Structures are given as C-alpha cells and as structure tokens.
Amino acid sequence: MRAGRVWVDGRPATELGMRVDASTARIEVDGRRVNVRANHEYLLLNKPAGYVTTAADPQGRPTVMDLVGTRARVYPVGRLDADTQGLLLLTNDGELTHRLTHPRYQVPRTYLAEVRGPVSAEACKRLVDGVRLDDGPARAVSANVVRRGKTRTQVELVLTEGRKREVRRMLEAIGYPVTKLVRTRFGPVDLRGVKAGTTRRLAPHEVGELHRIVGL
C-alpha cells in the first residue's frame, strides 16, 4: 500500500489496516478494479501445532475451525498438517480457493523450517534442483539458510505447490529431519502481527492481490 499501488474511491490508500465498506467502495490495485464481494469472508489464521486442517475430525482431535471466530461457513485454503504451524487462509470464495491451490497458478508459499544439524549451500541447491519423493519429483523455488545454531539450522523455503507434508519430506530426503515448521507467507499475504491461535480478516487490498495473482 505504501508504494501507492492500492487506490480506494479514487484516492491512494496508504494506511495499513484501513477499513472500507466492500459493498460500496471502488478498490483498484495497479489501476485494475478489484471486486470484493460483501458476502465473502477472507480470514488469516496463525495455526498452532496440534490442530488438524479440517472442519470435523472423526478422531476427536482439535481442528482449525475451533479457532475461527465467525458464523460464516469458511473453509481452509489447502492444508497444513497437524504438526505444522503458521499461516492458513480460510474463505467461502470457492473459485479463489480453487485457483490458489491449483498447481497451474504457481502461487508461492514461504516456510521456515528448523532442522537438526548444519545445512550446507550444496544442500540448499539440491532442494532447488529437485528431489525425488514417493509421489514424484519436488523442487523449491528458493532455499536459504537464515539462522545457524549449535545443533539446529533454520532454512527458508519457497514452494509453488502444496503436496502432503512436502516440505518435511523434501528435507528428510536429503538427510535433515524437521523439528519445527512454520508457514510464514501465502502469495502476497504474510503472518506478521497475528498471534498463534488467533485470526484476522484480510484487508481489501490483500484480497485484491490474491485475486490478481490468479487472474480473477
């Protein structure tokens, strides 16, 4: 917003978190009008570990819906496994959900993985070049060490697909068991400012950016 790309009712929107009436406001991103339907909900959840990404669990485990404070029938955009933390989008916008999760649209997801042991530049290169998993080859758009500790290393990875436990399996395939995994970003939306176990509504410009990157 601060770059002047978002306009509301003919004026630049520069205040993060500004509120507008989606049913009447004219919202533009990069000069292109964005239609945000008033009857659609768009939420961001900072998912804690221990919650499954489903509406109801036959085993009685806690689900992400237990954390969503809305009466609207929203659904997760893709999945995070129970042990994975971080950014999970929820919406009742079916077409947007379909496009955000379809490999054709190459929507980037950013993860911060903590693994045991030191991680070399060569190991990061292997993740980008691609590794073979049981369900086919997988590769990261980028993989970089962001923090080194005495016994553990943090690696940031960007992927454009969301196969089951893909990040964990990729790292395990090259010898690095994952001890903690957090998704920090989905497309243009990031996790900053949202405490674990809480949600916030997406701002109109964030909804607009999500629509834009998948051609809606």
PLM segments and residue spans:
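Basic, flexible Lys/Arg- and Gly-enriched helix-loop patches that mediate nucleic-acid binding at interfaces
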Residues: 1-216
